[in-house]
């Protein structure tokens, strides 16, 4: 049995293409892997606080010196990190907002990129500690950005995943969604057609 962690980050509940892709992905994954355990964390329904002084203090101070607010922030970060550590497959559903990922997804990443837990510093540089895991990224984009200089989403997420040791990363892009009805339908259909290859 494998554990799949799905991170939803679209601000929209209705008419969200990234959520449509997630729904279809779950159906196909469950059909192919009925014994697997799937956990969904929705960052729109339960937002993760952005990085702040309390979390930094919780990370850096000895336990006896942490304030109540720092302990609370650390406990939240530990919960998110433990979910990631337990997962065999990470799925991030990410619409493109202003050429990159939603700030809610960035906040989640800030909580789980943890020195000594998901990566470590060595004499030769940082080393990812989550080797052996797989990541799948489902994106929804108003324009067509794949391979273009305007894409600050895929390169960033590939870099972050590699930093924590995840090198097996697949991207499925639904693009051109705001260009016209024809482009929208084509973009959604092409993305959905690729789901079977990763599920």
From Swiss-Prot:
<keyword id="KW-0285">Flavoprotein</keyword>
<protein>
    <recommendedName>
        <fullName>FMN-dependent NADH:quinone oxidoreductase 2</fullName>
        <ecNumber>1.6.5.-</ecNumber>
        <ecNumber>1.7.1.17</ecNumber>
    </recommendedName>
</protein>
<dbReference type="Pfam" id="PF02525">
    <property type="entry name" value="Flavodoxin_2"/>
</dbReference>
<feature type="binding site">
    <location>
        <begin position="96"/>
        <end position="99"/>
    </location>
    <ligand>
        <name>FMN</name>
    </ligand>
</feature>
<dbReference type="InterPro" id="IPR023048">
    <property type="entry name" value="NADH:quinone_OxRdtase_FMN_depd"/>
</dbReference>
<comment type="function">
    <text>Also exhibits azoreductase activity. Catalyzes the reductive cleavage of the azo bond in aromatic azo compounds to the corresponding amines.</text>
</comment>
<dbReference type="GO" id="GO:0010181">
    <property type="term" value="F:FMN binding"/>
</dbReference>
<keyword id="KW-0288">FMN</keyword>
<dbReference type="InterPro" id="IPR050104">
    <property type="entry name" value="FMN-dep_NADH:Q_OxRdtase_AzoR1"/>
</dbReference>
<dbReference type="InterPro" id="IPR029039">
    <property type="entry name" value="Flavoprotein-like_sf"/>
</dbReference>
<comment type="function">
    <text>Quinone reductase that provides resistance to thiol-specific stress caused by electrophilic quinones.</text>
</comment>
<feature type="binding site">
    <location>
        <position position="10"/>
    </location>
    <ligand>
        <name>FMN</name>
    </ligand>
</feature>
<dbReference type="InterPro" id="IPR003680">
    <property type="entry name" value="Flavodoxin_fold"/>
</dbReference>
<comment type="similarity">
    <text>Belongs to the azoreductase type 1 family.</text>
</comment>
<dbReference type="GO" id="GO:0016655">
    <property type="term" value="F:oxidoreductase activity, acting on NAD(P)H, quinone or similar compound as acceptor"/>
</dbReference>
<keyword id="KW-0520">NAD</keyword>
<feature type="binding site">
    <location>
        <begin position="16"/>
        <end position="18"/>
    </location>
    <ligand>
        <name>FMN</name>
    </ligand>
</feature>
<keyword id="KW-0560">Oxidoreductase</keyword>
<dbReference type="GO" id="GO:0009055">
    <property type="term" value="F:electron transfer activity"/>
</dbReference>
<comment type="subunit">
    <text>Homodimer.</text>
</comment>
<dbReference type="GO" id="GO:0016652">
    <property type="term" value="F:oxidoreductase activity, acting on NAD(P)H as acceptor"/>
</dbReference>
């Amino acid at each position: 049995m494998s554990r799949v962690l799905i991170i939803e980050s679209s601000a929209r509940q209705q008419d969200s293409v990234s959520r449509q892709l997630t729904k279809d992905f779950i159906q196909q994954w469950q059909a192919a892997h009925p014994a697997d355990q799937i956990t969904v964390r929705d960052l729109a329904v339960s937002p993760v606080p952005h990085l702040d002084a309390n979390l930094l203090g919780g990370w850096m101070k000895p336990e006896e010196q942490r304030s109540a607010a720092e302990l609370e922030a650390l406990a939240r970060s530990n919960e998110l990190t433990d979910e990631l550590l337990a997962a065999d497959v990470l799925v991030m559903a990410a619409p493109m907002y202003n050429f990159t990922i939603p700030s809610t997804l960035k906040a989640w990443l800030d909580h789980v990129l943890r020195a000594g837990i998901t990566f470590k510093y060595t004499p030769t540089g940082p080393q990812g500690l989550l080797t052996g895991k797989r990541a799948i990224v489902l994106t929804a984009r108003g324009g067509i950005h794949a391979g273009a200089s305007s894409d600050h989403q895929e390169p960033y997420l590939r870099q972050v995943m590699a930093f924590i040791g995840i090198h097996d990363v697949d991207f499925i892009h639904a693009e051109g969604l705001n260009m016209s009805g024809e482009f929208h339908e084509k973009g959604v259909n092409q993305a959905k057609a690729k789901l079977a290859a990763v599920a």
